[in-house]
């Protein structure tokens, strides 16, 4: 942990910036401290260390997705309040109240942290331009030039997938509002980032991300890093490119970059090597920066673990049935079964890799479960007083997730057998000894089975997919999406899969002081799939996101209902 702390807790260049009101787009308008000059390759490299964000959208994405249930619904005797008010707002897909720097995991902290990283990357790029006429071909600067561009592309990639629609196609995504793509150092305040000069369509943002990836990816040199896992090393950069092209549906390129990351002999996680003695040992072994499977490690300020153990309101839990006020019976899928404690096509019971790795809330198993890697690190600022900061370690890119990206790309390229082979490599690395076959996949992901929690309603045609999978290929896709859900639980990736495939999500919820259960659904075209721009950013002039949805009336006309409206089909009549 010593190396990790040195690399991810020391913000080597944060004193370079005095954060000015970003119209209040805070981080977008950061100006350099005139007392500091970035005039050497070493200074540029150290500056880029501070460009990696200390926040993650994982908690917001998990709450928005179908990975969590409201325990007040599945355990009727409970009347739990959320750990934080905005957790309930996120679960109900409402606009989230404005929070500033005092609260972790909010839209504001994600927006601020990622745009701050973009500002740092831009300052590094600008400094290199002043140091060399051709930084990309300067042996002292080329590596940092590559890292800065790939990192800038990645930060915009996260922001556009959180605060904008999923990519559909080159035509339809031109009409979807994206985000501000910032490529310049701003030396003035009150810049209007809602101006088309900055705020681009989703399609334009993707084009600019691709430009940054291609500008930088071949220049990255792992030998320049002391600890590569905390930077965009070559494997991490190629894994990012694979995911980017998968989301853009350029499957040839997705396959190419996944192969670059994985190599001829993919080194997936060795779960048997994880020390089982204590929870802390498990987490330390999982996050070991020396493991070949850990492509990129990110430390954040987050209270996601505490949401699971201190509130037991929005949790991973078993499902069940209930009848609403209108007499309609609802089936609530078991999020426990489909994430960290359920069967698969070639294993029964719990996935072997997760055996002994799933923990329950101290109040009892009925109050939810969580996977060991969610456990937080605590950084003491005063050990005697017992105060400090909570950190969550995330791994944005791993070999295990990348091989699932490759399987999906292979499937769309017509190589179903190759996709199944990759899926079998994944199950094998997770301790499954039985072979994976198409017949087993078809049996597990049988869409004709009533209430099959392992399959989801997909709307690929509506989301712009040129190729819509059917039959056996669709079963393999269901398997891939299930494995992705298992692999990335707690990390928010399920939300992005929901967005890109138009997966329908149903949330049932009951307030702490309520007896009535509310039900709401999120269809493929519901604008609430886009998180609202933070209110303080909107107040400063950045346009808010339209999150209203048309509702058909009996006469065939329609009205717009605010996105915060919750349809209550279970009201008394």
Predicted regions and their residues:
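Membrane-proximal, proline-rich intrinsically disordered regions
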Residues: 25-75, 324-331, 502-573
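Aromatic-residue-lined binding/catalytic grooves and analogous aromatic/hydrophobic interfacial grooves
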Residues: 25, 234-272, 559, 564-566, ...
């Amino acid at each position: 942990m010593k190396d990790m702390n040195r690399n991810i807790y020391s913000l080597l260049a944060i004193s370079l910036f005095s954060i000015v009101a970003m119209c209040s787009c805070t981080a977008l308008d950061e100006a350099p401290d005139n007392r500091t000059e970035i005039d050497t390759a070493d200074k540029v490299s150290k500056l880029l260390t501070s460009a990696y964000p200390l926040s993650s959208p994982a908690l917001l994405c998990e709450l928005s997705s179908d990975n969590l249930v409201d325990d007040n619904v599945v355990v009727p005797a409970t009347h739990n309040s959320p750990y934080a008010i905005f957790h309930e707002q996120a679960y109900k897909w409402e606009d989230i109240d404005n929070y500033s720097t005092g609260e972790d995991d909010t839209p504001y902290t994600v927006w601020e942290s990622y745009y701050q990283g973009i500002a740092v990357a831009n300052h590094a790029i600008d400094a290199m331009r002043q140091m060399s006429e051709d930084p990309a071909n300067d042996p002292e600067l080329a590596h940092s030039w590559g890292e800065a561009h790939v990192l800038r592309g990645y930060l915009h990639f996260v922001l556009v997938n959180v605060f904008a629609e999923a990519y559909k196609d080159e035509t339809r995504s031109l009409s979807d509002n994206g985000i501000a793509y910032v490529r310049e150092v701003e030396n003035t305040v009150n810049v209007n980032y809602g101006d088309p000069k900055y705020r681009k369509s989703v399609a334009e943002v993707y084009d600019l991300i691709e430009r940054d990836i291609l500008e930088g990816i071949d220049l990255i040199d792992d030998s320049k890093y002391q600890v590569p896992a905390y930077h965009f090393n070559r494997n991490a950069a190629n894994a990012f490119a694979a995911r980017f092209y998968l989301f853009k549906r350029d499957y040839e390129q997705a396959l190419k970059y996944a192969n670059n990351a994985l190599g001829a002999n993919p080194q997936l996680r060795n779960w048997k090597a994880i020390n089982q003695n204590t929870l802390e040992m498990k987490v330390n072994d999982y996050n070991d920066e020396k493991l070949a499977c850990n492509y990129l490690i990110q430390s954040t300020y987050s209270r996601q673990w505490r949401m699971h153990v201190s509130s037991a309101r929005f949790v991973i839990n078993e499902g069940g049935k209930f009848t609403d006020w209108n007499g309609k019976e609802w089936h609530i899928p078991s999020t426990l079964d489909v994430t960290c404690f359920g069967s698969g096509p070639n294993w029964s019971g719990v996935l072997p890799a997760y055996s002994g790795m799933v923990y329950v809330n101290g109040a009892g198993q009925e109050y939810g479960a969580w996977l060991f890697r969610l456990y937080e690190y605590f950084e003491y600022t005063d050990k005697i007083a017992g105060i400090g900061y909570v950190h969550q370690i995330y791994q944005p890119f791993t070999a295990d997730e990348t091989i699932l990206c490759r399987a999906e790309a292979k499937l769309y390229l017509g190589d179903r057998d190759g996709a199944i082979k990759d899926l079998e490599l994944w199950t094998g690395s997770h301790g499954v000894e039985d072979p994976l076959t198409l017949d087993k996949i078809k049996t597990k992901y049988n869409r004709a089975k009533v209430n099959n929690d392992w399959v989801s309603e997909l709307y690929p045609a509506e989301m712009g997919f040129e190729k819509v999978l059917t039959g056996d290929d669709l079963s393999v896709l269901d398997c891939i999406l299930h494995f992705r859900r298992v692999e990335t639980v707690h990390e928010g990736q399920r939300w992005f899969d929901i967005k890109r495939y138009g997966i329908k999500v149903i949330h049932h919820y009951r307030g702490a002081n309520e007896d009535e259960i509310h039900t709401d659904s999120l269809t493929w075209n519901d604008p609430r799939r886009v998180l609202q721009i933070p209110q303080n950013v909107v107040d400063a002039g950045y346009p808010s996101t339209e999150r209203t949805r048309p509702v058909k009336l009996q006469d065939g006309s329609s009205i717009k209902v605010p996105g915060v409206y919750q349809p209550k089909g279970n009201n008394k009549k």
